[in-house]
Amino acid sequence: MRINPPTYGSEISSIEKKNRGCIVQIIGPVLDVAFPPGKMPNIYNALVVKGRDTEQMNVTCEVQQLLGNNRVRAVAMNDTDGLMRGMEVIDTGTPITVPVGGSTLGRIFNVLGEPVDNFGPVDTNTTSTIHRSAPAFIQLDTKLSIFETGIKVVDFLAPYRRGGKIGLFGGAGVGKTVLIMELINNIAKAHGGVSVFGGVGERTREGNDLYMEMKESGVINENNITESKVALVYGQMNEPPGARMRVGLTALTMAEYFRDVNEQDVLLFIDNIFRFVQAGSEVSALLGRMPSAVGYQPTLSTEMGSLQERITSTKEGSITSIQAVYVPADDLTDPAPATTFAHLDATTVLSRGLAAKGIYPAVDPLDSTSMMLQPRIVGEEHYETAQKVKQTLQRYKELQDIIAILGLDELSEEDRLTVARARKIERFLSQPFFVAEVFTGSPGKYVGLAETIRGFNLILSGELDSLPEQAFYLVGNIDEATEKAMNLKT
């Protein structure tokens, strides 16, 4: 069990001192390599295939099994096209090692920590291996505290835990990317923190779109790259399963350095955690393991736990993780999402219905949940106000069928008042984002939690019943809503 923070530094020894073996079998992305007796590499060591004669291959593999007879089985992190039996393989003597620290900000990396954005080499003076122990119990910060994001609907109805794990659910086109970018922007401005984005097994186009939008919104500063607020690590769905299985660990290793050495608060995004499980399932089958339920790997819980347990708060800093969760065939009992749910502290569900109404962020206030929304953690006032808001919205939801058939006039006076307040609440949950300024022309707003609670209390108390509901749409705090109402009257 590791007690002291890890040491970071140049961890690769010179090539001359390394063990050399040769390929004896290739089955797709899996290689069997023979080494001299007594020179066997350790499990998880990185092996590099150098090619023959003048042919430079540079295919990196990771040792997964020791087979006996001085052979190991390794999984490739790159394409294995062009590899042949008999090619020389070098044991690096260490697991995959990636650059960490400030030089990673504003750059895009692959699973091996190599920059893939054509902006030249990255400073590799400070590096770290991707396989590490979770922090020891005595290092953990066990105090429950809210991680304020400045986004009203999140902080008020489904608050994030500092050092916690949040599941992000939502289909295409409901504002997932914009929400992620706003969180990256707000953690940098309000907490002096940084973010790491791990693209695990998703579309290359989506990764490119995210990068372009980040440049447009200023999250990545092209002119002064060190001013950027995020490092990007991609292992997209066209890559071998080994790369997709390990890219989450590469992103996490970069985040751990910011937490342990720079003592910062870090946001780690993983998109998509299901693809991490899927890649592990592919690798497991390639290695000949007996599949478990629904064809998943027998080590599913162990693999998920080894990733998730490293995401936590320590006395130095915190890693708060937001993980997009794909639910195959909408089956929440599928082993992949079911194993993920066991680790989550909160869920943020994006609703297509709210997005269609133009309410952004389109976070569903009734479906999103958080274990932090308890009176002993958030306080009585916050808890009571949140419950009243949810009750009002739930009643509005129940009345919508009656309104659609009979109209508002058929409702009782009390129900009409509930509907009016619920519509104001729904609009007040929307908010202009800093990263969307370039598209909307409206300046972004960061709203503190105390301001948010005050605003909802005023709506629930009936003090603002006379204001039109459009005054509450896309504003920051409640004072802006009253000001907007005055402007609408004039």
UniProtKB/Swiss-Prot annotation:
Task: Output the GO biological process annotations, alphabetical, semicolon-separated.
Answer: proton motive force-driven mitochondrial ATP synthesis
Instruction: Please give the chief subcellular localization of this protein.
Output: plastid
Listed GO cellular component terms? chloroplast thylakoid membrane; mitochondrion; proton-transporting ATP synthase complex
Sorted UniProt keywords: ATP synthesis, ATP-binding, CF(1), Hydrogen ion transport, Ion transport, Membrane, Nucleotide-binding, Plastid, Translocase, Transport
User: Which cysteines does the record link by disulfide bonds?
Assistant: none
One MF term in the entry's GO annotations: ATP hydrolysis activity
InterPro entries the UniProt entry points to: AAA+_ATPase (IPR003593), ATP-synt_VA_C (IPR055190), ATP_synth_F1_bsu (IPR005722), ATPase_a/bsu_AS (IPR020003), ATPase_alpha/beta_chains (IPR050053), ATPase_F1/V1/A1_a/bsu_N (IPR004100), ATPase_F1/V1/A1_a/bsu_N_sf (IPR036121), ATPase_F1/V1/A1_a/bsu_nucl-bd (IPR000194)
Q: How would you describe this protein's topology in the membrane?
A: Peripheral membrane protein
Catalyses which reaction?
ATP + H2O + 4 H(+)(in) = ADP + phosphate + 5 H(+)(out)
Query: Highest taxon of the source?
Result: Eukaryota
Tell me which residues bind ATP: G170, G171, A172, G173, V174, G175, K176, T177
Cellular localisation = Plastid membrane
Q: PROSITE patterns of this UniProt entry?
A: ATPASE_ALPHA_BETA
* EC number of this enzyme: 7.1.2.2
Mind telling me which Gene3D superfamilies this protein's record contains? 2.40.10.170, Bovine Mitochondrial F1-atpase, Atp Synthase Beta Chain, Chain D, domain 3, P-loop containing nucleotide triphosphate hydrolases
Role according to the record: Produces ATP from ADP in the presence of a proton gradient across the membrane. The catalytic sites are hosted primarily by the beta subunits.
Family of the protein in this entry: Belongs to the ATPase alpha/beta chains family.
Note the subunit structure: F-type ATPases have 2 components, CF(1) - the catalytic core - and CF(0) - the membrane proton channel. CF(1) has five subunits: alpha(3), beta(3), gamma(1), delta(1), epsilon(1). CF(0) has four main subunits: a(1), b(1), b'(1) and c(9-12).
Database matches in PANTHER family: ATP SYNTHASE, ATP SYNTHASE SUBUNIT BETA, MITOCHONDRIAL
What protein name does the entry list?
A: ATP synthase subunit beta, plastid
The record lists the lineage as:
Eukaryota, Viridiplantae, Streptophyta, Embryophyta, Tracheophyta
Gene transcribed to yield this protein: atpB
